[in-house]
Structure formats: C-alpha cells, structure tokens
Amino acid sequence: GEPGGVGPIGPPGERGAPGNRXXXXXXXXXXXXXXXXXXXXXXXXXXXXXXXXXXXXXXXXXXXXXXXXXXXXXXXXXXXXXXXXXXXXXXXXXXXXXXXXXXXXXXXXXXXXXXXXXXXXXXXXXXXXXXXXXXXXXXXXXXXXXXXXXXXXXXXXXXXXXXXXXXXXXXXXXXXXXXXXXXXXXXXXXXXXXXXXXXXXXXXXXXXXXXXXXXXXXXXXXXXXXXXXXXXXXXXXXXXXXXXXXXXXXXXXXXXXXXXXXXXXXXXXXXXXXXXXXXXXXXXXXXXXXXXXXXXXXXXXXXXXXXXXXXXXXXXXXXXXXXXGAPGERGETGPPGPAGFAGPPGADGQPGAKXXXXXXXXXXXXXXXXXXXXXXXXXXXXXXXXXXXXXXXXXXXXXXXXXXXXXXXXVGPPGANGNPGPAGPPGPAGKXXXXXXXXXXXXXXXXXXXXXXXXXXXXXXXXXXXXXXXXXXXXXXXXXXXXXXXXXXXXXXXXXXXXXXXXXXXXXXXXXXXXXXXXXXXXXXXXXXXXXXXXXXXXXXXXXXXXXXXXXXXXXXXXXXXXXXXXXXXXXXXXXXXXXXXXXXXXXXXXXXXXXXXXXXXXXXXXXXXXXXXXXXXXXXXXXXXXXXXXXXXXXXXXGFTGLQGLPGPPGTSGDQGASGPSGPAGPR
C-alpha cells in the first residue's frame, strides 16, 4: 500500500543558551549568511555576497557552495568567482577564506576538469599568499583528480606538510573528507589511505587520522550529501581553528551525525549549522569557547534533536534559528492494493506421450477407416506412431502435427501383440492337386493385382513350399507396390500379413526373408503414412527389418507384429525426420518387444537392448525399451488357422442328348 503520511512536526527545541557575542560587525554579516545557509535558499547570490563580505562569511559560503555545487554547475561557477575573490583578499583571514574557497574549488573541480585547472591557478595565487592555503588547494585538487593526480597532489601535500605540520594535517583531513564527498570507488579509499599516511607524517596526525577515519566511515554509511556537508564543516573548522582538539571535536560531531543516519537531511542541516557556528567562533577568536561548545555537543550527541539544539546554542544569539522537529512516527501501513490482473497464458505444454498401439485385430478396421478417409487422414496417420491409431490417438496426432516444430517426444512402448484376425474365407479351389502350390502363387499374385484382399490373404496363408515362398515374396513385393500405388489400405494390411507368413515359411533364406520383410514394411508404411515419406522410410525399415530378422527366429505372429510395429515406428520417425539413430533405436525396441512377445530367448532381448544402447539411444529411449520388455510379457497369440479346404466344385451339367444311333443291321428273317 501507499506509505503513511508524514507525522506532525514536533515542537520546536528549547532555546539554546545565548552564545558569546561576536566581536566584529562582520560577524553579524556571517550570522546572516548562516541563516541563509540554514534556509538553503539564494545560495549562489548569497555566497557571492558573503565572499565579498568577509572571510568567515566566505567559510560559511563554502559550506553553502558545497551543497549548491552538488545542485548545479552554475553554483560551481559562483564558487570559481568566490575563489577569485579569495585570491583578491590578502590577509590571514583571507588565507582561511582561500582554504574554504579551495574546498569549493574542489567541488568545482569535481564538476569540471577545467575548473580543476583554475583551482590549480588559485592554488598558485594562494601559495603566493600562504603555503598552508596552497597545501589545502593541492589536497582539494588531489581529491577531485584521478588516482595518479591524487598521488601527485599527495606529493604536493607532503611538501605542504614540510611547510606547516598542523596545516598539512588539516589539509590531509580536508583531502580525505573531499575524497569521501567525491564518493569515488576503491581508488578514492586508496587516496584517503595515502592522505592518512601523509597525515601520519604530520605531528598532530593522530586526531587528523581519526577525523579522516570518521569521514571515511560516514562515506561508507552512504550518506553522500551528509558526508559532503561534514567534509565542508571539517575543512572550515580545521582552517579556522588551528587547534587539533577542535578538529577532533568536529570529527566526533560528524561521527555522531553519521550514527544518526536516519534523518540524512536533518544531519546535513545540523552539520551546516555546526560549520556556521565554528566559523562564527573562529571569527570571534573564541577558539576555546568553540571547543568547549563542540565538546558539549559531542557529549550531548546521544540524540539527533539534542545535537541540533547544541548546534543552535553554538550559533550566534542573534540568529536563533529554530531546529527542525524530530521526524514523525512511521505512518500505519496502507490498505493492500487491488489484486493483480491475470498473468499471460503459459507456454504450450510438452506434447503428450504417444498412445499405446491398439490390438492388431483393430488394425484392419482402422486401416479401412483410414482408406475411407482421404489423403488428409493418411497425413494424420503419418504423424501417429501406431499403425492402429485409436480415434483419440488420431486427434492427438493432429495436435502433434500442429506442433511438429518441437522435438519429437520419445516413442511410447509398443502395445502387446493383438489377437490374430479371423481366418479368411476359403480360397478358390485349386485347378490341379499336383501344381497346387505354383497355381496358388500365381492366383495370389493375380488376386492381389485385382485387389481381392481376402483371397490373397487366404492364399498366402495356404502357401507353404519354400521355393514357392521365395517366388511369392517377389510377387508380394510387386503386389505391395501396386497396392501402395492404389492406396488400398485393407489390401496393404493383408499383403503385410501375407508377407509376414511368407517370411516365416522362408526362414531358411535370410536374404529372402529380409527382402520380404522390407517389402512388407514398405507396404505397411505406404498404407499408414504418406507415399512421399515411404521412400525415406523404406531404407530405415529395411535396416530395422534385417535387425529384427537377425534378432529373433521368425515366428509367424511375432514376425507380423514386428513388421507392423517396426513399420509404424519407422514411419513416425520418418515423419519426425529428426534423428535416424532414434528411428533405429525405436525399431530395435520394437524388435525386442516382438521377441519377448514371441517368448524367445531372453538373451536375444538383452542383445537387442544392447544394440539400442550402442545405437546411441537416449536414456529415456533405453528406459522405454525396458518398459516395453516388461509390458510385452503378455502371452503371444497363436498363428491363425490356415483357410478351410475349398468346397468341391458343382457337378457338371448333364451332357447333350446323343445323336440317334445308326439303324441296326437287319435281323434275320
């Protein structure tokens, strides 16, 4: 919710004890300048007027200029004007003003490098006036410049330290404070460390080092504005009062302000007020009194309000600026915001797992339905994994086809072998008993060409001669090609079954079996998938069929199931067209399932699994293969019966009536 409103303004603090009266009228002008700084308004014009007015006013203006410099570049230009006025001045107070102006120039240098060059010129003028001012300006330039310039300025600061130890310590403290105000990175911390080392070379380095450490801690406290104000206050106090105790007191006050970081703005105002008070005290030459007041402030620094009251007390009696009240208590939490809008829809889910293959018996019906459907149905079937897709599976397949761009999901384990279909109707009667096999083969080829699916299946099942089987395999291949062209799904399914039977009969010739299996696979693929995919599928199917033939001894039902499953898997893989290796793995898994269903040796299944692993199948594929082996535990169905013997032919029609015989010879008389 929205944060609560600001609490009511606290009551104004008690009036501080009246401070010592300032000696000169310039002090009165300084008081006015301090009031302007507290008001934080008319900064540039007031700063210029103060610079023209007096050195103490210039010191106060330095604090105001620091905040103003953070505010805008125009204030930096005003600071440069103040620096010029300081150069025009030529008294000890003017030297102090030059030091304050140097701090302002440091802010200006932070604003622009050209201003840094001007600050160097001002430093030269100040050097003509006083070496201490030059050291302060050099330290300011070091704070403003980069690390290398800081090192050079550090050397200059060392020379300044040789000139005046106390002034050098003050300059080092100012430099550390300025660096903290600049809020540079670790380089600034290193510069501060170098300044601390230079201060260590100085006599009264201990207090200065403590002040520098306090300034660094304040900077680390992330109160950048407060740190800048504290830095200006420290510089003004150090330049005005040569006593290290006063600097230490100022540092303690700054530390207290940093501790009370809750109200950064209030702390900055208090620091500015303290700086104005220190400047007024310096102008009044009552350094001891200022130190005592600062010590009292440090002692009473427990509460920020107390510190503000102390600062007010330190200020001239004429100013009597009321301190801002303590911040109000935290407002109650606002009511909860309205509920957010519904998020955007999630991304499409992964494609679902493939459905298990339906029973083989249903396959014929499904194929017929596919044939009844147009080529679109064939395309859907191509997407489907199983040759015998259920209606729901077909719908899922359509969805998958839409999302074909995604990687193909792993093929699900093949379903258990279906029961064999019912025996076909009896085949046509053979012409002659002797040549029955050959005649049957020829008839089968003719029937297949004629697309008499039932008769072809019966004849193929009836065929049993090995030599005839080879011929039949060739004929079946031709028939399969014709059927594929005709796109008769039922005939294709029958041809696949016939080819499986022929392969079982012709197990003796491995090559013939492989050819037959390949032809069957091609036919099944053509029936199940689009004709275009069949060409690509043929090679993979042939390899898969060869692997299957090698893996398991051919059993009629097992071979048929293996051929159908392999063809379906190969077709799906071809449709995916992503990884031929995956297709090979799927074919291997199908072969393993077929072997298990046929109750073949377990070793063969293990070998098939090993082959799949060797084929770089994914781990998921391997798991699927294991699951398929587990699921394939169902008993294999027995092969279908051969068709009944054909009915005897109808009796022939009765012959025509014979011609009348010749008249008999004449009888004897």
UniProtKB/Swiss-Prot annotation:
Annotated positions of the 4-hydroxyproline modification: P3, P12, P336, P345, P414, P420, P426, P648
Post-translational modification: Contains mostly 4-hydroxyproline. Prolines at the third position of the tripeptide repeating unit (G-X-P) are 4-hydroxylated in some or all of the chains. Contains 3-hydroxyproline at a few sites. This modification occurs on the first proline residue in the sequence motif Gly-Pro-Hyp, where Hyp is 4-hydroxyproline.
Domain of life where this protein originates: Eukaryota
Cellular component aspect of the GO annotation: collagen trimer; extracellular region
Keywords assigned by UniProt, alphabetized: Collagen, Extinct organism protein, Extracellular matrix, Hydroxylation, Repeat, Secreted
Region feature (Disordered): 318-360, 405-438, 638-669
PTM annotation (3-hydroxyproline): residues: P413, P650
Cellular localization per UniProt: Secreted, Extracellular space, Extracellular matrix
Ranges of biased composition (kind: Low complexity): 318-327, 339-360, 405-420, 429-438, 638-647
Oligomeric and partner information: Homotrimers of alpha 1(II) chains.
Misc remark: These protein fragments were extracted from 160,000 to 600,000 year old bones. The tryptic peptides required multiple purification steps in order to eliminate contaminants and to increase the concentration of peptidic material.
Role played: Type II collagen is specific for cartilaginous tissues. It is essential for the normal embryonic development of the skeleton, for linear growth and for the ability of cartilage to resist compressive forces.
Family, as annotated: Belongs to the fibrillar collagen family.
Protein name as catalogued: Collagen alpha-1(II) chain
